[in-house]
Amino acid sequence: MKWKVSVLACILHVRFPGAEAQSFGLLDPKLCYLLDGILFIYGVIITALYLRAKFSRSAETAANLQDPNQLYNELNLGRREEYDVLEKKRARDPEMGGKQQRRRNPQEGVYNALQKDKMAEAYSEIGTKGERRRGKGHDGLYQGLSTATKDTYDALHMQTLAPR
């Protein structure tokens, strides 16, 4: 099949030769000079626009460096700004709806401090667990769950599949 297409393409090429660039006048030196001139003018215009935008932006930025009406101001590392003085009173917590924070007891903290005297004999305090009971109770498996959650787990316990 490929050789039929190749033969047909060769016959069409011999029968109808392709148009040459010379017949359209594209190799005329006057046309080349005209296109070169257009390209040169385009390059000059683009370069002028680029330089104008670059230099006008830097001059404009220097003039309006710290305008109070601007949404964003650039950082000025040469000038040091002072922070607001924090109030010594307890601040209102926005996460608690503006209410004052109450002082927490050390026992209410999320993390407890390590007690080094107990850490010296850490492995001696680890006890061995008894053997778990197997059966319907699952009490050892669901330690620390409420009775409602335990009932849900018991109801959803995997059931054996019927043989096929």
Curated annotation (Swiss-Prot):
Modified residues annotated as Phosphotyrosine in this record: Y72, Y83, Y111, Y123, Y142, Y153
Membrane topology listed for this record: Single-pass type I membrane protein
Tissue: CD3Z is expressed in normal lymphoid tissue and in peripheral blood mononuclear cells (PBMCs). Expressed also in retinal ganglion cells.
Statement: the UniProt record of this protein carries the keyword Phosphoprotein: yes
Molecular function via GO: protein heterodimerization activity; protein homodimerization activity; protein tyrosine kinase binding; transmembrane signaling receptor activity
Highest rank taxon of the organism: Eukaryota
Signal peptide: 1-21
Transmembrane segments: 31-51
Coiled-coil intervals, chain numbering: none
Residues annotated with Phosphoserine modification: S58
Cysteine-cysteine disulfides: none
Every ITAM domain range: 61-89, 100-128, 131-159
Region Disordered, annotated ranges: 87-111, 124-143
Cytoplasmic side: 52-164
Residues in the Extracellular compartment per record: 22-30
Disruption phenotype: CD3Z deletion causes severely defective thymocyte differentiation. Absence of CD3Z also leads to altered dendritic structure and motility in developing retina.
Blocked amino end (Gln): residues carrying this PTM: Q22
Function: Part of the TCR-CD3 complex present on T-lymphocyte cell surface that plays an essential role in adaptive immune response. When antigen presenting cells (APCs) activate T-cell receptor (TCR), TCR-mediated signals are transmitted across the cell membrane by the CD3 chains CD3D, CD3E, CD3G and CD3Z. All CD3 chains contain immunoreceptor tyrosine-based activation motifs (ITAMs) in their cytoplasmic domain. Upon TCR engagement, these motifs become phosphorylated by Src family protein tyrosine kinases LCK and FYN, resulting in the activation of downstream signaling pathways.
Assembly behavior: The TCR-CD3 complex is composed of a CD3D/CD3E and a CD3G/CD3E heterodimers that preferentially associate with TCRalpha and TCRbeta, respectively, to form TCRalpha/CD3E/CD3G and TCRbeta/CD3G/CD3E trimers. In turn, the hexamer interacts with CD3Z homodimer to form the TCR-CD3 complex. Alternatively, TCRalpha and TCRbeta can be replaced by TCRgamma and TCRdelta. Interacts with SLA. Interacts with SLA2. Interacts with TRAT1. Interacts with DOCK2. Interacts with SHB. Interacts with ZAP70. Interacts (tyrosine phosphorylated) with SHC1 (via SH2 domain). Interacts with PTPRC.
Entry similarity comment: Belongs to the CD3Z/FCER1G family.
Domain comment (free text): The ITAM domains mediate interaction with SHB.
Name of the featured protein: T-cell surface glycoprotein CD3 zeta chain
Protein species of origin: Mus musculus
Gene name as annotated: Cd247
